[in-house]
From Swiss-Prot:
CDD domains: PAPS_reductase. GO terms for cellular component: cytoplasm; cytosol. The NADP dependent reduction of PAPS into sulfite involves thioredoxin which probably plays the role of a thiol carrier. It is an enzyme of class 1 (oxidoreductase). The keyword Ligase does not apply. Pathway: Sulfur metabolism; hydrogen sulfide biosynthesis; sulfite from sulfate: step 3/3. One of its GO terms (molecular function) is 3'-phosphoadenylylselenate reductase activity. InterPro entries: PAPS/APS_Rdtase (IPR004511), PAPS_reduct_dom (IPR002500), PAPS_reductase_CysH (IPR011800), Rossmann-like_a/b/a_fold (IPR014729). Transmembrane segments: none annotated. This is Phosphoadenosine phosphosulfate reductase. One of its GO terms (biological process) is sulfate assimilation, phosphoadenylyl sulfate reduction by phosphoadenylyl-sulfate reductase (thioredoxin). Present with 217 molecules/cell in log phase SD medium.
Amino acid sequence: MKTYHLNNDIIVTQEQLDHWNEQLIKLETPQEIIAWSIVTFPHLFQTTAFGLTGLVTIDMLSKLSEKYYMPELLFIDTLHHFPQTLTLKNEIEKKYYQPKNQTIHVYKPDGCESEADFASKYGDFLWEKDDDKYDYLAKVEPAHRAYKELHISAVFTGRRKSQGSARSQLSIIEIDELNGILKINPLINWTFEQVKQYIDANNVPYNELLDLGYRSIGDYHSTQPVKEGEDERAGRWKGKAKTECGIHEASRFAQFLKQDA
């Protein structure tokens, strides 16, 4: 039987994983998936870059925290985010985490505190010269380091099937063997319209770039507004074949991680 070794010496079998997904698909709301996950998995965090789905999850977690604990939040600061994203991060921290005496865990590229530091260390416009290396240094390595240092075994993500490409085949719970974590996708079956409706109905702060035609927001150099009728992630890496930044495709970077081990 296939077994997976997670952080904190937790062992999960493929049979368990399949059973969880079979049972969770029967639940009617994301809140039920979230509540079940909180009571089931130790060392549970949320990871987000403050996209709409992640913001919905934060608000749901906050409301559920009256009964359950509030999982801590991990943010990977690539040092290339839009200023609006960083402003939103501060707003979210003040609204949701400071009242619970929590701070958002921020991880940056190793040895860098600013975009200038990153360019000085790795060269200007690395994303144009070696896209995989950039993704590894700015996103994959900081996330891997965070999972280990914070002893994370499971994370909530904001991925949904309606985002298309590889995400259309998502399961509610997935294994990330390289990082030793489970990834839980509580809003897996929601559409963009459902997500935005929740944001508006619950007065959840969101990135002001959404009002300028952006839908999926990543680094400033690889994010564009989308046109009417386009896939919501069509503005990411426009003109390139890639659809993921690397954080959710860690196995692609196994060789880099081995070199750094």
